[in-house]
Regions:
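Generic marker of residues within folded, mature protein domains
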Residues: 10-13, 32, 55, 143
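Bacterial Sec-dependent N-terminal signal peptides
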Residues: 1-26
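Residue-level marker of alpha-helix boundaries and capping positions
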Residues: 81-82
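Substrate-binding cleft and catalytic face of glycoside hydrolase catalytic domains
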Residues: 27-28, 60-78, 87-185
Length: 185
C-alpha cells in the first residue's frame, strides 16, 4: 500500500510537471512550479541531508521536509529523560539554514517507542494515568525544542494496525485481531 501511494504521488508529480513543461526544462524545480498552489514535500533522513547530490535535489524541488524517523519517540528519547537530539537537530538546522518548512513526524507511534513509555521497571504495563504522564513529558520536550521551525506535527502515526501485522513485535505479543495491538491503545 505504501509503495502504491509513493508510486502514485511520483506519477502525479511527473504528469503535472510534463503538462507545464517544467520537468523537461531542468531549470525550475517542483516547489517553484507549484508555489502558488501547494507545498511540495519530501521525507528525509540523515543520509539524504548528508549527500551533496540529494541536498541539491531537496533544495531545488522541495519546500517542506518531514523527518522520516529522526523525530520519532524512540530515537529522540530512548529512555525516560535521556534525550538524543543529534539527528533531529541536524534536520531542523538544515531546514532553518535553507528556508525549508519542517513537518514534525511523529509525536507518538506504537512501532518506534521506548518501553519506558508504557512499561514500568518490572516490565509490567503502566496505568493509563502514568502512560499519559509519560506521553505528556515526551511531547512537551520535543514540541518546545522545535517550536521555532516546525509548522505542523503528525501527532499520532498508525495508532492501530491496518491489518498488515499480527503480533511479533517486541513487547506487544500476539493478538487475534488486527485492532488493539498497540500498547498505547
Amino acid at each position: 500500500m505504501k509503495h502504491l501511494f509513493k508510486f502514485s504521488l511520483c506519477a502525479l508529480a511527473l504528469t503535472m510537471g510534463a503538462n507545464t513543461g517544467f520537468a523537461q526544462s531542468g531549470e525550475t524545480g517542483l516547489k517553484d512550479a507549484y508555489k502558488d498552489y501547494f507545498s511540495i514535500g519530501v521525507a528525509v533522513n540523515m543520509r539524504n541531508i548528508s549527500n551533496p547530490e540529494q541536498i541539491a535535489i531537496i533544495k531545488k524541488d522541495f519546500n517542506s521536509i518531514t523527518a522520516e524517523n529522526d523525530m520519532k519517540p524512540q530515537p529522540t528519547e530512548p529512555a525516560y529523560g535521556q534525550f538524543n537530539w543529534e539527528n533531529a537537530d541536524k534536520i531542523a538546522n538544515f531546514c532553518r539554514s535553507n528556508g525549508i518548512k519542517l513537518r514534525g513526524h511523529c509525536l507518538m507511534w506504537h512501532a518506534q517507542i521506548g518501553e519506558w513509555m508504557y512499561k514500568d521497571e518490572k516490565g509490567d504495563l503502566v496505568s493509563k494515568e502514568k502512560l499519559f504522564q509519560n506521553m505528556k513529558h515526551h511531547i512537551t520536550a520535543i514540541v518546545e525544542r522545535y517550536k521555532d521551525v516546525i509548522y505542523a506535527w503528525d501527532v499520532v502515526n498508525e495508532a492501530i494496525s491496518d491489518g498488515g501485522w499480527q503480533g511479533g513485535r517486541r513487547g506487544m505479543g500476539e493478538h487475534p485481531s488486527p485492532y488493539r495491538n498497540s500498547p498505547l491503545y
